[in-house]
Amino acid sequence: MSGHSKWATTKHKKAANDAKRGKEFAKLIKNIEVAARTGGGDPSANPTLDDMIKKAKKASVPNDNIERARKRGSGEEAGGADWETVTYEGYGNGGVAILIECLTDNRNRAATDVRTAMNKNGGNMADAGSVAYMFNRKGVVQLPKEGNTEDDILMAVLDAGAEEVNDLGQNFEVVSAAGDLSAVRDALKEAGLEYDSAEPDYRADVKVQLDASGARKIFHLIDALEDSDDVQNVYTNMDLSDEVLAELDN
C-alpha cells in the first residue's frame, strides 16, 4: 500500500495571487454552506462541515466569513443560495481527459463558462459519460509529514478500508474508496493523527504522459476553467515524469 508520486493527484493547485485567492475563498465558503445544509450546522456532529471549516481556516479565510457561511447553510441566517453540483466532461491538448466539477446556482451560466474556457484554450467538450468512465471516485486524506510516519498511518488505516498510503514528498496521502472516507478519517482521529484535509477526489485509471510543452497547455486550460466562480475542481488524467516536473519548475 505504499507508493511515491509527486503528481499523485492531478487536480491542479492554483497560484496564490490576490485574484485567485479571492476566488479560492469563495469556493471554500460555498463548500461550507453546502456541508452545513446537507449535514447540519454543528461541526462536532458533521465531520464534513468540520473538515471544510478547517480547510478554510488553513487557507486564511476570515472567521467571520466562515461563520456566516455556516449559518446560511444551516438556515440560521438568510441568504443561502440553492447550490447544485454539475459535472462536465471534455478533452484537452494531447487527448488528456478532463472532468470539471461545478457548484452553481445557475446551471446555464456554468455551462457557458466551461464551454467558453474549453473552446478558447484548446479543449473540446465531450458527451456525458464519454470521459467519466476513465475516473474512479475516491476518498483522499492528506496528512503533514511533521509528526507522522508512514508506518503509523498504515497501522491506523489498515482495517478502515484504505487502499494506498502515498508519500508525496512534503506530505502523505491515504486513498480509499469514496464510501470508506469517513471510516479512514475516524481511524486517523482515533489514532491521534492530525490530517490536513479529507475529501472525495477523482483518480484516473489510465494516465496520459505529457512533455513540458503539453503540460503548460493543460495548466493554461485549467487556469481558464478555474477563473469561473462556478468551477470548484478540475481533474485530469495527465501524468508528468520527474524530468518534466523539474523542467516546469525552472
UniProtKB/Swiss-Prot annotation:
Its main location: cytoplasm. The keyword Nucleotide-binding does not apply. It is found in: Cytoplasm. GO terms for molecular function: DNA binding. Disulfide bonds: none annotated. One of its GO terms (biological process) is regulation of DNA-templated transcription. GO terms for cellular component: cytosol. It comes from the Bacteria. Belongs to the TACO1 family. This is Probable transcriptional regulatory protein ckrop_1032. It comes from Corynebacterium kroppenstedtii (strain DSM 44385 / JCM 11950 / CIP 105744 / CCUG 35717).
